[in-house]
A protein has these predicted regions:
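Short, surface-exposed beta-strand/loop micro-motifs that present aromatic residues
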Residues: 16-17, 139-140, 454-458
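Noncatalytic, helix-rich "gating/capping" subdomain that lines the substrate-entry/channel surface
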Residues: 60-360, 364, 401
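Short, solvent-exposed loop/turn elements at domain surfaces
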Residues: 34-38, 160-161, 475
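Active-site-surrounding "flap" and adjacent substrate/cofactor-binding loops of secreted or lumenal enzymes
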Residues: 21-25, 29-90
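Intrinsically disordered, low-complexity linker/terminal regions across diverse proteins
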Residues: 54, 206, 212, 235-248, ...
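Extracellular/periplasmic catalytic domains that process cell-envelope and extracellular macromolecules
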Residues: 18-22, 144-145, 458-461, 577
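Short, Lys/Arg-enriched N-terminal segments with co-localized hydrophobic residues
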Residues: 1-13
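Hydrophobic/aromatic-rich, well-ordered segments within soluble, folded domains that form packed cores
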Residues: 15-36, 170-190, 554, 561-566
Length: 648
């Protein structure tokens, strides 16, 4: 049974005259009626806020795709190709005819790995055929010189949601989840031409190899400290770590030359690589690659396998039903053709008046931030100058890009092929494009998110913010909402993203996005004290579905704090400002009803605090909250002045 989390804490049903007080629980006071009305769709783990907007955008765009397909009229050749992929993915009859065979044909490449010695010769082939590897090679922005690219190596993914699940204290959850996964794997492997004995052997070996990986790869908490991914090593040093393979040969075949330096994103994993991948574990690896590769392929095969392949994630996220074939087809197509789809959505559904108004808010926030930095008491003048310089250089990407990237012109596929082969072809083009980037300069004009995505981000290595058109709607933003409501919604979110330039990660990068210590020793010491206080404010909070890890979510909490601080200052200068509207809309944007399983998953995987804490804890740090609602010491949303945290 899935228990729905309706409220912050369990309470006896009250009379209508005995409602939750805003001074005790802002989130529930604002969202209680909405939470009672919301119904979580069978194919979703949650509803409300971001998710509701995303579903609405999806409905709009599915209808757009269907109309284009029906009329055979497309705004451009990119959307024509996207709709072609949509139709292929929706063709259940063709997928049934193709069955499991496209995946089995690709997996047969593993048969060519006759001995451990052949692995290095076949690495490129395995990579381009998208088979799971014991380590990945990719090209990324060089974090210390963001104008150029670098070569990175990274460990593989694990079966459990996160590497933290392999720790002793998670043994019970681990056993339960691996039981669900094993059940799924057995049903999928039964569709292959392997004997029952081999099927079981492959699955057993996969679990053994996965256990080796799980004890070495990074946890989500470790990944959240993204600056710590940057561990440059001379290629000669990496060769000694990977001495069980011919690493230089692999690099030469992929790039045509051997890079001098490699960025080792997971030092612990690669220091133990010889224990992970050697002659004794080679068969374990082959069987792991086969099983994981097949399961990862299921969504692109027939409907029965698409259903089977989703069992594990649906079980751990509390989702009863699989995504419909139509939704799946749209999601696949709009993901692969993300920029053209986002550009179309933005041009059609995001008005120039709104874009102008939002952009005005952005620059008002940046200017206010500069003033707050100048008046900040924890920074010395030299550090303030650097911080203000960084703010001056922040790029703003609002709505959607002017044009799509050139790679979409390379997306050519055979419409008669199976869905598996079509997607395989397109992903292969992306892999090649990534490798070819190694000698090219980075492109700061590239958008991190497409226009139809309900999200926003700050890119620390470009020093810019991206706000896709899809998030720029009610309750976050509307030209019809008051300025106070918009500041409590999209304004605080914009401030949040800008604040990432100065969070526990972003503060380590300069105005060009390069890792560069621009802080004085004393400033850094005072800043670290603030970080520790922010960790403490959230750490260990008990919710009905689990305990909060303050270290894991500290950067996002700092950003929420900064976003509220800067927009509350703007409120002071806003004509007819209503702090009630500001705080109530702040709570409204975080409204979410979710399955317990999903909420538990987020505690381990999501770098953001649970929505209820984002709504309820951040305001407590600001005097405006206390003045607006006359919050007293006896109220639950009261924090003593000495414990309130305002960083920027």
């Amino acid at each position: 049974i899935n228990y729905i989390i309706r409220l912050y804490y369990t309470r006896i049903k009250m009379m209508d005259t005995d409602k939750v007080r805003i001074q005790d629980d802002l989130y529930t006071y604002v969202n209680q009626e909405k939470l009672e009305e919301l119904v979580i769709p069978d194919d979703q783990p949650s509803v409300g806020g971001f998710q509701t907007l995303a579903v609405d955008v999806e409905k709009i765009m599915i209808n757009e795709f269907k109309e284009m397909c029906a009329k055979g009229v497309y705004p451009n050749h990119y959307l024509e190709k996207a709709c072609t992929l949509f139709k292929i993915a929706k063709n259940a009859e063709k997928k049934e005819k193709d069955g499991i065979f496209p995946a089995l044909k690709n997996l047969s490449i593993l048969n060519e790995l006759e001995s451990f010695d052949t692995f290095s010769n076949m690495y490129k082939s395995l990579m381009f055929n998208q088979l799971p590897l014991p380590f990945q090679i990719m090209v990324e922005t060089d974090m210390k010189n963001t104008k150029k690219h670098c070569v990175c190596i990274q460990g593989p993914s694990v079966i459990l949601p996160d590497a933290s699940y392999y720790k002793e204290e998670m043994a019970q959850q681990k056993e339960m989840l691996l039981g669900i996964w094993t059940n799924m794997a057995k049903m999928i492997m039964a569709k292959t031409n392997l004997s029952l004995e081999d099927q079981n052997k492959y699955i057993e070996d996969t679990l053994v190899f996965d256990e080796i990986l799980g004890r070495l790869v990074k946890t989500s908490e470790e990944w959240s400290k993204y600056v710590e991914m940057y561990n440059p090593m001379k290629v000669s040093k990496v060769v000694t770590l990977l001495k069980t393979i011919r690493f230089k040969q692999i690099l030469k075949e992929l790039f045509g030359f051997i890079p001098e330096t490699i960025i080792v994103t997971e030092p612990r994993y690669f220091k133990n690589f010889m224990n992970v991948f050697n002659e004794e574990t080679f068969e374990l690896y082959k069987h792991w690659s086969y099983v994981i590769g097949l399961i990862d392929s299921c969504s692109l095969l027939n409907e029965e396998l698409r259903e089977l392949g989703s069992m594990y994630y649906r079980a751990i996220a509390g989702i009863p039903s699989n995504t419909s074939i139509e939704k799946f087809a749209y999601q696949l197509s709009s993901n692969i053709y993300s920029e053209p789809v986002g550009l179309y959505y933005g041009e059609k559904y995001f008005g120039e008046e709104a874009k102008k108004d939002i952009t005005e808010i952005v620059y008002q926030i940046i200017d206010t931030y500069k003033t707050r930095i100048q008046n900040n008491e924890i920074l010395e003048e030299v550090t303030k100058e650097k911080a203000i310089l960084k703010l001056s250089k922040i790029g703003v990407k609002m709505g959607y890009p002017d044009k799509v990237q050139d790679i979409y012109n390379k997306f050519v596929f055979n419409e008669e092929d199976s869905l598996y082969d079509v997607v395989h072809t397109l992903k292969e083009i992306k892999i090649l494009e990534n490798l070819e980037d190694v000698t090219k300069p980075t492109n700061p004009e590239k958008w991190a998110m497409p226009g139809h995505m309900v999200n926003a981000c700050y890119d620390p290595f470009v020093n810019d913010i991206t706000f896709p058109a899809a998030i720029l709607q009610t309750p976050f933003y509307s030209i019809k909402q008051t300025r106070s409501e918009n500041l409590g919604g999209i304004g605080a979110v914009i401030g949040h993203e800008i604040s990432h330039a100065f969070d526990s990660n972003g503060a380590k990068c300069d105005e060009y996005g390069n890792i560069n210590n621009w802080w004085t020793k004393e400033d850094k010491k005072r800043f670290n004290t603030k970080i520790k206080a922010m960790i403490k404010q959230f750490d260990g909070i008990e919710l009905p579905w689990g305990k909060v890890n303050g270290k894991f979510i500290v950067s996002e909490n700092m950003a929420d704090n900064g976003g509220m601080a800067v927009t509350l200052e703007i409120m002071q200068k806003t004509p007819n400002a209503s702090y009630e509207e500001y705080f109530e809309n702040w709570a409204k944007v975080w409204c979410m009803k979710a399955k317990t399983e999903f909420l538990q998953l987020l505690l381990n995987l999501d770098v953001h605090a649970p929505n209820i804490l984002r709504a309820n804890i951040t305001p407590r740090n600001f005097q405006e909250w206390y003045d607006t609602f006359h919050v007293q010491k006896t109220d639950k949303m009261y924090i003593a002045p000495g414990k309130r945290i305002v960083i920027w």
